[in-house]
Amino acid sequence: MLKSTQVILIFILLISIVESLSWLALGLAANRFDRDKPGTSCKSLKGLTRRQMRFCKKNIDLMESVRSGSLAAHAECQFQFHKRRWNCTLIDPVTHEVIPDVFLYENTRESAFVHAISSAAVAYKVTRDCARGISERCGCDYSKNDHSGKSQFQYQGCSDNVKFGIGVSKEFVDSAQRRVLMMKDDNGTSLLGPSQLSADGMHMINLHNNQAGRQVLEKSLRRECKCHGMSGSCEMRTCWDSLPNFRHIGMAIKDKFDGAAEVKVVKEDGIEKPRIVMKNSQFKRHTNADLVYMTPSPDFCESDPLRGILGTKGRQCTLAPNAIDDCSLLCCGRGYEKKVQIVEEKCNCKFIYCCEVRCEPCQKRIEKYLCL
């Protein structure tokens, strides 16, 4: 029988796990951030933990970048998964709250991707906005600028300040992983036992995937240069470090999703902190840059509201055997129906001098295939 203290602490642990992604609802908040009234602006936001609320009040000038990051993360997730059974439906556009995707809190592959992409997106938006001068506390990274003239190129201009962006992401995004300290009785035994280890393991894996996403961002920095010299001889180049389009980062994290490592969390005697290890010890150990997960993903075929799974009924599919959204795969063997839609479009357009464009109305037949 669990004691009342254990029940309360287990409840707190579960709440902290559920809150780990709720801040993504920031992207749909309608209000703007008033720098003169940080308390009012932050209190009106949904989904923030207490630590994130404190961050908001102290760093109101960065919150627009954080919100842009949540939007970018959601958009990129939907792009990468729009043809799959789980299409990254995360936020309810009516309530502006994160849909309770329970499976995301079970440390699945999908959870790993969402944590990594959201962490990277916040760092990305803060970094780019710093270069635009949105905050007096950050700007370009001039640390690499070289004025010695010894090399064939010189770092000059505005390099993206990735270190600052990563620091903000780590402080804001990682703070959602609230930790409840291990509580022990007089004999040194954990009051929560396996529940504590399980919750600690979930937090550790979420933090690992957050960091993996930021590593992808940092490694994506590329050097851009401009040539100087007579007749384009490029005798001297001035260079700066710049981040690519966020789509490039999203694709890199998606590749890591495809190769994610299945792990488990173990607590060894004499070592206070649990460790993340490969579930199958015969496989090569994961690295800090790999995405990791503990729970195999559901098949997402049937609707399961209690777990936040929408199912694939009514989803549009294609008749392409090798495609991810092929009807036989997306519809989970339930079959599909064909719907024909006639739409009117403009065609045979001609330019009439002067200055008019005349078109003829045309009907176009569109066939759609929907999962049963």
Swiss-Prot record:
Keywords: Cell membrane, Cytoplasm, Developmental protein, Disulfide bond, Extracellular matrix, Glycoprotein, Lipoprotein, Membrane, Neurogenesis, Secreted, Signal, Wnt signaling pathway. It is a peripheral membrane protein. Palmitoleoylation is required for efficient binding to frizzled receptors. Depalmitoleoylation leads to Wnt signaling pathway inhibition. Glycans are attached at residues 87, 187. A lipid is attached at residue 231 (O-palmitoleoyl serine). Its main location: secreted. Expressed in intestine, some head neurons and ventral nerve cord and pharyngeal neurons. Expressed in the tail and weakly expressed in the vulva and body wall muscles. Expressed highly in posterior dorsal and ventral muscle cells. Disulfide bonds join 77-88, 130-138, 140-158, 225-239, 227-234, 301-332, 317-327, 331-371, 347-362, 349-359, 354-355. It comes from the Eukaryota. It is found in: Secreted, Extracellular space, Extracellular matrix; Cytoplasm; Cell membrane. One of its GO terms (biological process) is cell fate commitment. Disruption phenotype: Defective ALM, BDU and QR neuroblast migration and irregular HSN and CP axon growth and guidance. Double knockout with cwn-2 results in ALM and CAN migration defects. Double knockout with either cwn-2 or egl-20 results in HSN migration defects. Triple knockout with cwn-2 and cfz-2 results in enhanced neuronal cell migratory defects. Coiled coil: none annotated. GO terms for cellular component: cytoplasm; extracellular space; plasma membrane. Residues 1-29 form the signal peptide. Pfam families: wnt. Belongs to the Wnt family. Ligand for members of the frizzled family of seven transmembrane receptors. Probable developmental protein. May be a signaling molecule which affects the development of discrete regions of tissues. Is likely to signal over only few cell diameters. Binds receptor tyrosine kinase cam-1. Together with Wnt ligand cwn-2, regulates the migration of CAN, ALM, BDU and HSN neurons during embryogenesis, the migration of QL and QR neuroblast descendants during larval development, and polarity of ALM neurons. Also acts with the Wnt ligand egl-20 to direct HSN neuron migration. This is Protein Wnt-1. The gene is cwn-1.
